[in-house]
A protein has these predicted regions:
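Long, low-complexity intrinsically disordered regions
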Residues: 156-168
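Accessory low-complexity/Zn-finger-associated flanking regions
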Residues: 1-81
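Catalytic cores of histone-lysine modification enzymes
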Residues: 61-158
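Short amphipathic alpha-helical segments embedded in low-complexity Lys/Glu-rich regions
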Residues: 40, 113-114, 161-162
Length: 168
């Protein structure tokens, strides 16, 4: 099942800051407005610029615009179950997917581990010491990204409006 983003943050961020990139005056080169190499304060703090920001070329709205890499779920050949593979080259810093699922307490997570049993695949991702995302019964394809001793992805917490999102 595909889940909607359910992770919410009850604290307000205090409004979206305007970027100091010169975007409103057309001072930034095309494609660089709030991009990886820009001076966008929001991006440096892992806060996405909201649609209300006054420049249409903003490169810091990837989660809102679902600008994910093209990927595909596949059955692994080595008995590990399901995996996720890229259908295109992914560069360092690119957004692969958003990790989406049901947000539960760590106590609920422990109870679900007992309920699911040892043979049931689980897809938990800890947000902090008190909260966990459980993507076992509903979530995005990001739950099929497997552990690696030689990892090529990382998780990042991003603020989008009043929500906290987990980007990979």
């Amino acid at each position: 099942k595909r889940a909607q983003r359910v992770l919410t943050n009850v604290a307000e961020l205090g409004g979206n800051k305007k970027c100091s990139t010169g975007a409103g005056a057309g001072g930034a080169p095309p494609g660089s407005v709030c991009g990886v190499t820009s001076d966008c304060e929001n991006r440096h703090m892992r806060i996405e610029c909201l649609n209300s920001v006054d420049h249409k070329d903003c490169q810091n709205q990837r989660l809102q615009k679902k600008q994910f890499a093209r990927v595909e779920v596949f059955k692994t050949g080595d008995g590990r179950g399901w995996g996720l593979k890229a259908l295109e080259d992914i560069s360092s810093g690119d957004l692969v997917q958003e990790y989406i699922g049901e947000v539960v307490t760590t106590a609920m997570c422990k109870a679900r581990l007992r309920q699911y049993g040892p043979d049931t695949p689980v897809y938990f991702l800890a947000i902090n010491r008190k909260m966990v995302i459980d993507a076992s019964s509903k979530g995005s394809v990001a739950r099929f990204i497997n552990h690696s001793c030689d990892p090529n992805c990382e998780t990042e917490k991003w603020e989008v409006g009043s929500e906290t999102c987990i980007a990979i």
